[in-house]
Amino acid sequence: MPWDDFLAAQGRFSPDPASDFYNKYPVDIDLCQRFGINGIRVSIAWSRIFPSGTGEVNPEGVAFYHELFATRNKAGVIPYVTLDHFDTPEAFYQDGGEGFLTRTTIDAFVEYAKFCFAEFTEVKHWFTFNEIPATAEGSFIVGNWPHGEKYRLDKAFQLMHNMMVGHAKAVVAFHEGGFEGEIGIVQNLEPKYPLDPNNAADCEAARMADVINNRWVLDATFRGHYAADTMEAATKLAHIAGGELDVRDEDVAALTAALPYNDCLGVNTYKCQFLRAAEGENDINHNGTGDKGSSRWFLKGVGESCVREGVPTTDWDWIIYPEGLYDLLLRITNDYPNYKKTYITENGMGYKDDFEDGFIDDAPRIDYMRQHLAWILKAIDGGVNVDGYFVWSLQDQFSWTNGYNKRYGLFYIDFETQARYPKASAYWYKNVAETGLLMA
């Protein structure tokens, strides 16, 4: 994605140096070893391998990733590698290109994936994409990502569909190539609840929101097609936005071909959404500052996002409802029984950490993780196959839409000096990793 130009035009903040993992990864891997972290996620920047998206390979980029993966494997910090984590090359947005809305990008992605599978055989855990629904939402619903369009549900669904076709083709290529390891996809999945479960209109609002965020990509992954009511809802919302969907027979064939080969599903989960039915025009405001109460979410054809009384929220208005993760995992198991296993690939709390004399007391983050892990254990007891948990995140970092004040890390970063400091949550997490017990 053309993030550099997009962020420069906004003028809010710069993505440099962020956490500088490119240069600091030996330090971060050492922290992993010291604090009981045996696996972390990392992505390959497509344009570091193919600067123009296709064609000539950059040998320096290839060498860097070999070194990174070797260092991590030697340290016992296993790499779980994503091929495209919000950074589709800018080349696909030039000369009239619209990223994955342009179908030739699908084929380019598959060729890039094939190269990586063959080149980086030391990697045994692959994900194709990170958070396709978030990509669509930021690009075409909220409009705070490049493309920067708002309320275009037609383009949002089309983008997700095209990316899912790319995922499916890459998954088939991985298995046809006989590569060792596993492959899946990471999605940001978010439970949707009616504000009043006894109100049919609220239930319908929650169902429509669920199609946007969850069912569209889950159907594509585990059904190999879109269920009739899923397609009906998506088509309705596309028409409200003034567009049509282009779902071709050969696309469905590609999704179907991948069905046996989706080895795992990565679930990124932070919050849920309560919805009520409402009539009116679109009105969404993203809270990217931490000014609590400033977010709005009203989507025509869906409804309005609300806060249920007694349910806490973060300063960024994200609803804290750990039980929702349990509901989500059981739902995946019940609705898509052909799934094989899940990883919780992101879970954590954005917080305004206070740095005082080298110590960061982030008790709310500890409480957040403890509650979510407890519900994960309950889901496992209920028959869900959860094979791993990745806290988001290892260290504080730059956020595309929030800048630097929304910190997620177990390790605090002084962005001026790049020094790392363990937070209270890092010590708590170390204890959990070493004992297997959810300590208070």
Where are these regions (language model features)?
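Active-site region of glycoside hydrolase catalytic domains
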Residues: 1-9, 52-54, 62-440
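N-terminal structural segment of carbohydrate-active enzymes
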Residues: 1-58, 62, 68, 74
